[in-house]
Each structure stands twice: as structure tokens, then as C-alpha cells.
Amino acid sequence: MSASNSLVRVEPLAPSFAAVAGQWAQRLGLPQELAEAEFALQVGEAGLQLQLLEAQAPGPVRVDFVEGAAAHRRQFGGGSGQMIAKAVGIQPGIRPRVLDATAGLGRDAFVLATLGCEVSLIERQPLIAALLDDGLSRAAADADVAAIAARMRLLEGNAIELMQHWRGEPPQVIYLDPMFPHRDKSALVKKEMRLFRPFVGDDLDAPALLSAALELASHRVVVKRPRKAPAIDGSKPGYSLEGKSSRYDIYPKKKLQA
């Protein structure tokens, strides 16, 4: 399947969304009429969503921080006892400034923002960045999650370049979750991988990503990996936290303090 943006069209799900669909098409440089399109970026009541166009296609993928899995995890996810919280160094009185350099659909960044961290997110793929931007805009308009969304700042572009030319105070913690060839086998993740892999592929530049992160982060770098996957080539992690399906490799530089 081609990853070319020429095989993506933008379409409104109702006439009332035609103007917004036109704005997205112009912003992303995508057509609104394309009979041979393999994907549709759809605009509707629930916001922006990406739909694979084939007979047995799974449902659309969108970013939703207000309802569904994100809301459930926000309410019942285990708070600062979650492994990701321990990995980035959240402790009583410590909420590090985090850069999520491989944002994807923003789930991990949202968890960290829910726990009180200021999080910058980098996403290099324009379609995924658009979904993320739309999800953050809807979250900002919701009374329950607006304060969380306000702690999240989206940056679009190549993470290595953005880190190498970072301006301002460096993040204390940089979080990386590179796309890996063999990932979580849950139905939701399978659906998302089927949609996104044609666009993003595997992160073959993960070693360069880690190197740039280690240069920029002031306190630590955290890399999420499938539990049995090897560490990224290059510097060795100082220690790891292991869960049922994932592992967090921690590269400490300096102790986080309140």
C-alpha cells in the first residue's frame, strides 16, 4: 500500500462540515475528490478522523481525550503509581517538564499531562499531527479536560531536527516511543498500526533520535519498548522498568529534585 498523500482525500461527513473539510484539505495539501483514494480524512460531528477505504476496513481512528479510553484512564488509571509516571520521575512535589518526541496519538503525553506535567509533543507525520491538533482543540473546549490540554503543546516536524535546534529551556525529561516492527497485539493498536504504518513505517532512525534526546534532556531520557525488544543501538540504559507487555529503558543524567 502506498504511503503517498496523493492517495488520501478529505471529505465532510455532512454538508455542514464542507467548509471545515476544505480548510483541512488546503492546510494539508490534499484533494477533496479522488476516486482511487485508499484513505479518507473525514470531518464530522466527532472531529477529524482517518478512515481506511476498503471492504473489510476497521473503523476510523481519531484522537479523543474527552471520552472513551482516555477518560477511563484519567479517572481510573492508577495516578502517579503508573509505570510511565515512575519512568519519567514523577514523585511527590516533582512534575518534570517532558518532551514526548514521538507523540503519535498523544496517549502517553495525555497521561503525563493528567498527572500534572507540562508536556511538549512532537509529531512528524502531517496527517497524525492533524488528528492530534484536532483532538487537543476539542479537549481545550471541554470543561473536564481543558486544564490538562493547556499543559500540552504540539510541535510539528522532524524530532531530531527540532531537538538539535531547540530554543529556550531544555526539557528535563525526553520520552521516546519509536514505532517498532512487532508491537502490542491488542485490537485497538492493531487497527491503528494498519492505518498508520503506510505513512510512518518503522523508526529506523531510532538511534539518532536517542542520541539527540540525550544531548538535549537535562535530567533523563525514557524509551518505551516492547518488553522483549532489544534496547536502541547506542548508549546503554542505566536501568529499566518492566511491565507485562512494555519496558521503559531509563537513561539518567541528573537527579530530579522538587
Curated annotation (Swiss-Prot):
Chemical reaction(s) catalysed: guanosine(1516) in 16S rRNA + S-adenosyl-L-methionine = N(2)-methylguanosine(1516) in 16S rRNA + S-adenosyl-L-homocysteine + H(+)
CDD domains: AdoMet_MTases
GO cellular component, one term: cytoplasm
Domain of life: Bacteria
Positions in coiled-coil regions: none
Keywords: Cytoplasm, Methyltransferase, rRNA processing, S-adenosyl-L-methionine, Transferase
Sequence positions that bind S-adenosyl-L-methionine: R107, D108, E123, R124, D177
Enzyme Commission designation: 2.1.1.242
Database matches in InterPro entries: 16SrRNA_methylTrfase_J, SAM-dependent_MTases_sf
Subcellular location(s) of the protein: Cytoplasm
Function text: Specifically methylates the guanosine in position 1516 of 16S rRNA.
Family from the record: Belongs to the methyltransferase superfamily. RsmJ family.
Name the record gives this protein: Ribosomal RNA small subunit methyltransferase J
Organism: Stutzerimonas stutzeri (strain A1501) (Pseudomonas stutzeri)
Taxonomic placement: Bacteria, Pseudomonadati, Pseudomonadota, Gammaproteobacteria, Pseudomonadales
